Amino acid sequence: MGGTLAWTLLLPLLLRESDSLEPSCTVSSADVDWNAEFSATCLNFSGLSLSLPHNQSLRASNVILLDLSGNGLRELPVTFFAHLQKLEVLNVLRNPLSRVDGALAARCDLDLQADCNCALESWHDIRRDNCSGQKPLLCWDTTSSQHNLSAFLEVSCAPGLASATIGAVVVSGCLLLGLAIAGPVLAWRLWRCRVARSRELNKPWAAQDGPKPGLGLQPRYGSRSAPKPQVAVPSCPSTPDYENMFVGQPAAEHQWDEQGAHPSEDNDFYINYKDIDLASQPVYCNLQSLGQAPMDEEEYVIPGH
């Protein structure tokens, strides 16, 4: 009974003493003044969406544990940690880091707690080359499980092609694809032209001047007579194009005499004329015979020329 009572009295003292071994973390507000000086040994800036300054160092010379988790940081500027000589634990979990400065990795006494990320490859290489007798480096996955950093990098971050090489491969693939598409099209068009040309050459053509079948063309015939000297034509008295014109049936013969010379039967023309009332009326007239122009040339033209 006395032993139980003694343990009951000593347990709170032991717990209080064990808690004093861990540094008490000071939780900062969202509005952090980087010009202020922090005297605490543990600073908690977790989840404040902070942006670390690149041109000045954190004024916390006594800090041992610095928690920067959950701030969306993509890099850790080496200037920010320049005066943190006592820093032993740096927590940058839940930050999408893309680069870790080599000078920070060269601090062999610094324990980095970070997500498993290929950006830690430089940290791993510098530690391996400069820090001997170190424990295996660890990283954390999304379920907060620990993994060996070397094993993670070997499996998930195998050396790949350089950006220029990848670009060249992509361009070459596009060119090959274009040639693969254009090649058959050009070959098909050349084949069609060759077949059409061979068909034209195999057709039996007639004589050079003869008509070519299928084209609907006719040969050109022409004959031109030598220019004839102009012969003076005796002038004849001008006569009207008509002498008599009547509407309806012609009257008696004496009516022709009253108008002038008797009409010649060879020069008579008969025209049916319809008046406004659409009644047919015969029209008689006498026209002087017109001479035909001499046919100086005969020419037969091929259609299309």
From Swiss-Prot:
Assembly and interactions?
Answer: Interacts with RIGI. Interacts with SQSTM1. Interacts with p65/RELA; this interaction promotes the degradation of RELA through autophagy.
Q: Which UniProt keywords apply?
A: Cytoplasm, Glycoprotein, Leucine-rich repeat, Membrane, Phosphoprotein, Repeat, Signal, Transmembrane, Transmembrane helix
What InterPro entries does the record tag this protein with?
LRR_dom_sf, LRRC25
> Gene symbol?
LRRC25
- Residues carrying Phosphotyrosine: 284
Regions crossing the membrane: 166-186
Residues exposed to the Extracellular side? 21-165
Write the signal peptide boundaries. 1-20
Q: What membrane topology does the UniProt entry give?
A: Single-pass type I membrane protein
Tell me the compartments it is located in: Membrane; Cytoplasm
**Entry GO terms, CC:** cytosol; endoplasmic reticulum; membrane; microtubule cytoskeleton
The species this protein was found in: Homo sapiens (Human)
* Start and end residues of each stretch annotated as Disordered: 204-229
- Which residues carry a glycan? 44, 55, 130, 148
Main localization, broad class: membrane
Give the Cytoplasmic compartment stretches of this protein: 187-305
Give induction info: Down-regulated in CD40-activated monocyte-derived dendritic cells.
- What does the entry state regarding organ or tissue expression? Expressed in plasmacytoid dendritic cells (PDC), monocyte-derived dendritic cells (MDDC), granulocytes, monocytes, B-lymphocytes, peripheral blood leukocytes, spleen, bone marrow, and, to a lesser extent, lymph nodes, fetal liver, and appendix but not in thymus.
PANTHER family with a match to the protein in the record: LEUCINE-RICH REPEAT CONTAINING PROTEIN 25 (PTHR20878), LEUCINE-RICH REPEAT-CONTAINING PROTEIN 25 (PTHR20878:SF0)
Q: What does this protein do?
A: Plays a role in the inhibition of RLR-mediated type I interferon signaling pathway by targeting RIGI for autophagic degradation. Interacts specifically with ISG15-associated RIGI to promote interaction between RIGI and the autophagic cargo receptor p62/SQSTM1 to mediate RIGI degradation via selective autophagy. Also plays a role in the inhibition of NF-kappa-B signaling pathway and inflammatory response by promoting the degradation of p65/RELA.
UniProt name for this protein: Leucine-rich repeat-containing protein 25
Q: Where do the LRR repeat units fall?
A: 39-59, 62-83, 86-107
